Amino acid sequence: MIQIFLRVKKAQPSSDASNKYGFLTVLNDYEILLESPEDSHAYRVSKSKTLEKASFTKVFPPSCTQLDVFSTICAPLIADSLVNMNDTLLFTLGVSGAGKTYTLFGPSDRPGVAFLALDALFYAIKGREASPQTVEFLRSQLEKCKIVEASKFLRGEAPLDIKVPNTEYYASHFPKIEEKNYQYAIYLSFAEIYNDRIFDLLEKASFFGHRHALSLKKSSTSDKKSIAGIQKVFVSNTTEAYKLIQKVLQLRKSTSTKSNSVSSRSHLIMSIELFKVCTKSNKFESCQIDLVDLAGSERTRSAETSGLLLREGASINRSLLTLGQCLEALRRKHEGKQHIIPFRQSKLTELLFHSGHLSGLAGINMLVNIDPFGSFDENAQVMRYSANAREILPPPLNENSGSQSPSHSLLQKSKNTSSTKALTSHLEQLQQENQQLRMLLADADSEMMNLEYEIRQQMTREMEERVSEVERTFLTKLLEESAQGIEYTDQKLEKMGGWMKKLQDENSEKTETIAQLEQIIEELHEELRSLEEESIKESSATQQNENQHKRSSRKLLYEDKQAIQEAHTINTKRKLWPQSTLIQAPNSDDEENVPSPSPKKKVVSPIKPLSPSRRPPLTSLYSGTTDIDINEL
């Protein structure tokens, strides 16, 4: 059973009415009216304003808070899972920038549904949290899953200050678990559907930022399909859960487009798995709460995307179109008509249907987000998607509606008639006409869906051709730039070749100059060697001359000494013997004939006089001699 809710993005009301926001008018708590503006495609086609009325289980105006949304659409799902252990699903639908991610997650001061749901779960199981032994028991039982601790991913993560409601609020909305023989464990997993491939957001990406794509596999105990190999993280408190969600939001693929500054490029599926374990028998049961943040549909013209972003947008639109077709087929099946549900055309619908959500095995709430000041055509298309599930909606929450069906009006008017049989006949006729009109409307809807599908296929082909043309233009431009780069490189190489030749010529000249200088140096070395040899020879000759001069000096000294001794002897004789005696007795036989000393000849030495520095000192020449009085000589 699907319930559809509508949330209007925060905006200021128009000046003419307090309940009118752009092209949207909130009629009451469950109905809105869309009025096409003049710049819309619908206005240009019809050449006048078009009015579209849509009904929902509940309409949230822009003034509603995050807690209001949680209390209405998510709190009943959480309570059902806690009490009855039923699987539940909440997914958002809307154009890019309509506020889907804000509703599910939100900032820390206005936390979204995901944070409030976890806070409510931990409040309900407070005092009944799983012990370490229970956690190990579950790990052993869930062998096919990758069970990891939250601390593996939260090293170095800063704590988050999430503003959550007080305990009085939870006490009034959720039952407190009082069963003493049961313990509860909460596991979180995060899957991303990007370009129709499933990835685990908690898997560590490679060096190039790639992750391993996962597949869907059937469970051994049921026909449900689950994501094989995805990591399930055990969280023991809200702090770990909040940090884990914050880390995942940073890893999710997003970019900036013209229509949305932070546009999600993938569908995010956050799974909260609640395990209930009996401590006595070790039996356990589980339920799964899935929160799905669908990427927003966008038009290429308004988003101005190209290349990779264009392919991402086309993949998102294809998966959303398949989801709309599945909802339409589910509506027809609910009416008793045999219709094939094309859920295998997209990984998103295959996961939602095979997990038991859209097949009627779980409670489903769908939240449609609308931007009243955005594109009318895109938001109207989202309204048509949500209309596919109207036939399986429960009655609106507000039963005091001002509008009544024609059959009801007829019954009111026929109270005063007395013919009950005629009234019954007329009522059967109206029911037949109503059935025929329903069949005609269903056929018209089918034709419109087929026409829309053909138009979208044609637009897709045209867009692919446009993308191919853009790629060809880009490749042509790239080749031209490459050719210019090659030409520029050739010119540079040619200039470098000229410079190299010039440098080689200069190098040759310098090499010759170096050879000449080396030859001159060699000649100088030869001259230096010859000069050294001459110097050695001159030094040897000088040494010989010095030696000869020393010998001559010693000889002269010896002769001078002999002369001095002879002079001293003569002087002594003169003192002892007078000169007359010496003169008178020349012929005496008794006396010795002493000849007079002949004058000493001056010996001229052929040796050059020594320089003062080389002349021996007089003390060395006259050492050992007797002092002689020159006057006496």
From Swiss-Prot:
A Pfam family for this UniProt protein? Kinesin
* Matching PANTHER family: KINESIN-LIKE PROTEIN SUBITO, KINESIN-RELATED
Q: What's a GO cellular component annotated to this UniProt protein?
A: cytoplasm
GO MF term set: ATP binding; ATP hydrolysis activity; microtubule binding; microtubule motor activity; plus-end-directed microtubule motor activity
Kinesin motor domain boundaries: 1-392
Q: Which SMART domains match?
A: KISc (SM00129)
Q: Which GO BP annotation is one of this protein's?
A: mitotic spindle elongation (spindle phase three)
In its UniProt entry, what is this protein called?
Answer: Kinesin-like motor protein 9
So what does this one do? Kinesin-like motor protein involved in anaphase B spindle elongation.
Which keywords appear in this protein's UniProt record, sorted alphabetically? ATP-binding, Coiled coil, Cytoplasm, Cytoskeleton, Microtubule, Motor protein, Nucleotide-binding, Nucleus, Phosphoprotein
Q: What is its main location?
A: nucleus
Identify the stretch(es) annotated as Disordered. 393-423, 531-556, 575-633
Please name the SUPFAM superfamilies in this protein's record. P-loop containing nucleoside triphosphate hydrolases (SSF52540)
Q: Where does ATP bind?
A: G94, V95, S96, G97, A98, G99, K100, T101
Record field: compositional bias (Polar residues): 398-423, 578-587, 624-633
Q: Phosphoserine-modified residues are where? A: S605, S611, S613
Q: Which family does it belong to?
A: Belongs to the TRAFAC class myosin-kinesin ATPase superfamily. Kinesin family.
Q: Where in the cell is it found?
A: Nucleus; Cytoplasm, Cytoskeleton, Microtubule organizing center, Spindle pole body; Cytoplasm, Cytoskeleton
Low complexity bias spans? 604-623
Subunit structure comment from the entry: Interacts with ase1.
**Entry comment on modification after translation:** Phosphorylated by cdc2 and dephosphorylated by clp1. Dephosphorylation is required for the interaction with ase1.
| Coiled coil feature spans | 417-541
